[in-house]
């Protein structure tokens, strides 16, 4: 009796194992970067495609396993051979029909996912290992440049123009849309249409060098009015220092050469190699998602950049006196 109970338990466990593994796999898909919690029109279509294809795969798997078990129990003979052939051809026809239907369904979705946007255009350049973001004007205006964060208005189809000046990167924001490669010398496009507000995490999904794993970005979806207010603020020049510490930090920022690589609009800093820092204090992270944007993190980043993000182009400034680093950090904290 005990042996029989153990056998039954083992059989139940073996049958339940795939379901348990499936549930654990889905549990790992939660969070800011989940494709199964869509917050955009394109992501919702992709999630529907995933679930429908998963259901089709389960149906085919059950049919094939069931047919194999049934065929293995047939007794040899003319009758068994006829049934075996029927099972073989029936299973093949059913699987082909289901797979063809899934293919057609996927192809029908593609034109809508790639349709052009009808409003705002944003140019995003993936660079080792950060993101240059430029909001393109509708007329002859000047692009508004930012870095490592993309802000979108709720409910609008926004077209992203994606490229890279160095190696292949891949722009991937699972809650809002699919993955699109960024190829040097080419411009690829991705259209996003957010359906709810919030902050969502994205990442480079193509290995691009030493600090590939430290190349994240955020997409912040705002109500339309809030987005327009933010865009107007982002277009403005930097805020003048309002304390002696910040004024000293601005002086040192220019003196030690930070302005050769970074732009701070409204000052003599006009470098284009690194991120635009005009409103760096309004961003949530430093170093493309590597550190939170706090006072201590700013000091660490300035003093020992290369240890935090290997092979990054920005040199470490640890040789500067501690008070100088603190002053530069205070200045950057004021650039909201």
Specify the residue positions occupied by each region the protein language model found.
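N-terminal secretory/membrane targeting signals
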Residues: 1-31
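Non-transmembrane, membrane-proximal soluble domains of secreted or membrane proteins
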Residues: 30-49, 73-272, 287-310, 316-330
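Alpha-helical transmembrane spans of integral membrane proteins, capturing the lipid-embedded, hydrophobic core
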Residues: 20, 24, 58, 62, ...
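Alpha-helical transmembrane segments
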Residues: 61-75
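Membrane-entry segments of alpha-helical transmembrane domains in multi-pass membrane proteins
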Residues: 42-62
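Short, solvent-exposed mixed-charge patches
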Residues: 335-336
């Amino acid at each position: 009796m005990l042996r029989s109970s153990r056998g039954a338990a083992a059989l139940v466990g073996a049958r339940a194992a795939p379901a348990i593994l499936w549930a654990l796999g889905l549990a790992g898909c939660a969070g800011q970067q989940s494709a199964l919690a869509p917050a955009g029109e394109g992501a919702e279509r992709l999630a529907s495609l995933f679930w429908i294809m998963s259901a089709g795969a389960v149906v085919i798997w059950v049919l094939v396993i069931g047919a194999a078990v049934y065929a293995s129990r047939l007794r040899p003979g003319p009758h068994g051979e006829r049934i075996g052939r029927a099972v073989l051809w029936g299973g093949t026809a059913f699987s082909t029909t289901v797979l063809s239907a899934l293919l057609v369904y996927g192809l029908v979705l593609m034109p809508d996912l790639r349709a052009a946007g009808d409003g705002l255009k944003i140019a995003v350049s993936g660079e080792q290992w950060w993101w240059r973001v430029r909001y393109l004007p509708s007329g002859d205006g000047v692009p508004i440049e930012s870095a490592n964060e993309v802000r979108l208005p709720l409910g609008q189809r926004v077209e992203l123009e994606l490229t890279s000046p160095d190696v292949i990167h891949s722009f991937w924001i699972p809650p809002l849309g699919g993955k699109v490669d960024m190829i040097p010398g080419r411009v690829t496009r991705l259209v996003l249409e957010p359906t709810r507000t919030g902050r969502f995490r994205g990442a480079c999904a193509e290995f691009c060098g030493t600090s590939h794993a430290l190349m994240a970005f955020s997409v912040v979806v705002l109500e339309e009015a809030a987005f327009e207010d933010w865009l107007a603020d982002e277009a403005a020049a930097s805020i003048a220092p309002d304390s002696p510490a910040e004024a000293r930090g601005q002086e040192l920022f220019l003196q030690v050469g930070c302005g050769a690589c970074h732009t701070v609009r409204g000052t003599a800093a006009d470098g284009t190699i690194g991120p635009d820092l005009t409103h760096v204090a309004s961003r949530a992270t430093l170093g493309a998602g590597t550190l939170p944007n706090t006072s201590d993190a700013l000091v660490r980043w300035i003093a020992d950049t290369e240890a935090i993000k290997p092979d990054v182009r920005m040199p470490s400034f640890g040789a500067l006196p501690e008070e100088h680093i603190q002053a530069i950090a205070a200045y950057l904290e004021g650039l909201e």
